Amino acid sequence: MTVPAARSGRKVYFIGLNAVPFLPLVAGLLRTYAEQDPRVAAGYDFQEPVFLVDGVQEMAAGITDPDVLALSCYVWNFRRQMKVARLVKERHPGMLVVAGGPHVPDRPGDFFARHPYVDVLVHGEGETAFRELLIERLADHPDYTRVPGVSVRHGTEAVPGRPAERLPRRIETPSPYLLGVMDGAVATCRQRDLRFYALWETNRGCPYSCAFCDWGSATMSALRLFDAERLQEEIEWFAEHDVEDLFVCDANFGILPRDLEIARALADARAATGAPKLIRVNFAKNSNDRVFEISKTWHDADLLMGTTLSMQSTDLDVLEAIDRKNIGLENYRKLQQRYATENIHTYTELILGLPLESPRSFRDGIGSLLEAGNHEDIRVYEFGILPNAPINTPEKIAGYGLRTVPKRLYVEEPGTPDDEAETVDMVMETNAMSRDEWVDCFGFVQAVQFLHNGCYTRYLSMYLRQRHDIGYTAFYERLQQYFGARPDTVLGSIYLRMRKLYHDYIDIPELPLANLVASQPDMAADLARYGKRRGWTIDNWGWLRIANDFERTYTELRDFVAALGVDDTSDPDLAEVFRFQQDVMLRPDYDPAAGRTTEYTADWPGYFTTGELRRRPVRMRLADQRFGANGRYTPVPGDLKAFARAAIGPSYPVSRIGHYRHRFEAAEVTSPAEPVLTEQR
């Protein structure tokens, strides 16, 4: 099936901007659903969607003779799209401007007074409302209040339309992929040599109503399904068109029994054609056997970006405040062990600044996740207040003392006006956490992310926990205190620079949420040798700073551990643990062709794999050839750009799979008396 040839008719334009190239699925779904009606198909000429970010003036100039301009609004694109709409409306005052998406407020309030160039707001699901708007526009005297699920501008006031209509439980909309509607966007990305992501829905809806999220309310909660035959044909389309990166947009993939069959079909396509290569997905909130089987299927097929074991917080009072039910720490521990047994990468997401979360509960929560076995990937996000999130009411904001700061999302070019700079209201203070405590908590987070998740102190801290009963929270709190008082040390200078940056981040509106490091000349200079990228994160910066002062850092860490009461006199194994910790780190001079060999008086590779220490001499041969998900990155001795790609990976998507260190669990471990084999792993 192919998209109909271009024809004369009223021009319809879509805008849905993303900093990362996502194929414009929303535009495709709205178009294919609307064109089922012969009046729409005959009366309108749909233009290629605008989905790649460009200058506002340039985007506006590219919209010629529009009759309808549709905006898919998110927190990351709202202001730019509004300005494009305003500029185009000034040239074409008779066109219809329709705004939909999660950033369109359910309660319009003074929206039309602030944005008088917008004519109609679509609330929630858009297919039915958009089709009916297009049909109504063909009338001699259109009355958009006849359309379901909209608010219509009347002067500066909002007049509601009819009650919203949603698609049925079995969603039978045409596929924009199978009809060829997405072909133009794919061609554009490939012509510009852009790594792009195909967005894909298998179901729609979310049965949860977490207070910080607008997904459940936006999708009206009930789960509705796309046809299984259509999904199989779309999988075949992705494979035939060599779509490497797939983003499954479901809110809870794995919640339905059929999701395992969908996962297997994707794995089969990967095995048969090589595509897709990587899948990003929002797994079901309460992980279950099905999510495990899906994860194992994709792990075995080399498709998995990691499995989420959801938390947001480990504190029960916090979870109650945000209407969130979690799996519990004991179940979390069992799941973590189950995934680890199969070598499946998991990650856990927390949010800093949630209602009732104190500095102590937050730090102890991270420590409890480490105690449960999540040593590879703990991700912490700031708490942004979304327009339609259940918590966004005056009563709840005041009741929890949520004090926000409007933050820019991106590093903007000098002179970028405020009405083009995307912002989000970030919670920087609550009744339970002051601003200084918020800063200290983020410093603690970064220490865990680039030292523990990033492996520099992971095995050292595991050893101290197991042999000396120094808990993870205590280890990283004391590390933060020790080096924070020693600015001349490597870690001290890193920590204090991070602390200053977070204070500046609160106080300076222009400092952005994303690409924060790129806004700091001194940090950018530190990273220049590793290649140019806007997406360096703070933990990337910290990790590479240590890579540049590797030996000195470990000398200073030995002094810190001695301050904890553990030294070579009290623990004869400590020196070898330090050496093992250093040996497993990926270094700029590593040569995959040669590998590395090291010897120990005890089986430390086995100890950090099984927890059991065997007192026997061993030789460990490290022969890793490639790093990262799919083994995409090969280090080259002395090539710092190749080193950074192998050690850290790309800026997007964030993945800690296969980075930072050698896979000693798969290394060749023998007795020093045995000959060394040469096979590479």
UniProtKB/Swiss-Prot annotation:
Keyword Mitochondrion (UniProt): no
Residues that, per the record, bind [4Fe-4S] cluster: 206, 210, 213
EC numbers, comma separated: 2.1.1.394
Binding-site list for cob(II)alamin: 18, 72, 74-75, 103, 126-127, 214, 249
Family assignment from sequence similarity: Belongs to the methyltransferase superfamily.
Function: Methyltransferase involved in the biosynthesis of the beta-lactam carbapenem antibiotic thienamycin. Catalyzes two consecutive S-adenosyl-L-methionine-dependent methylations to build out the C6-ethyl side chain in a stereocontrolled manner. In vitro can use methyl viologen and NADPH as the iron-sulfur cluster reductants.
Name of the protein: 2-(S-pantetheinyl)-carbapenam-3-carboxylate methyltransferase
Organism the protein comes from: Streptantibioticus cattleyicolor (strain ATCC 35852 / DSM 46488 / JCM 4925 / NBRC 14057 / NRRL 8057)
Name of the gene this protein is made from: thnK
